[in-house]
């Protein structure tokens, strides 16, 4: 039974009125804690966290799962 997670954090949005300040930190904190608990964790942060890449990574996470696996998708952003 595998433990797998993806942690996504987006601070920077187009323009500067919609920017956030703690989302990347949140994703990194989650990733660190899940890693301590035995999860295999990947992260997507800021510009690397495009809609297409998020969908691709979640699909990969789900399709690689087998019965009994635990999956976590954590998102911090708008």
Question: PLM features: residue spans?
Answer:
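Boundary/activation segment at the start of structured domains
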Residues: 1-78
């Amino acid at each position: 039974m595998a433990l797998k997670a993806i942690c996504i954090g987006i601070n920077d949005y187009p323009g500067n009125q919609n920017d956030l300040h703690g989302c990347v930190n949140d994703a990194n904190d989650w990733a660190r804690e899940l890693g301590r608990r035995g999860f295999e964790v990947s992260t997507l942060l800021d510009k690397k966290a495009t809609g297409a890449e998020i969908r691709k990574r979640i699909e990969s996470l789900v399709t690689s799962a087998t019965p009994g696996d635990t999956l976590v998708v954590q998102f911090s952003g708008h």
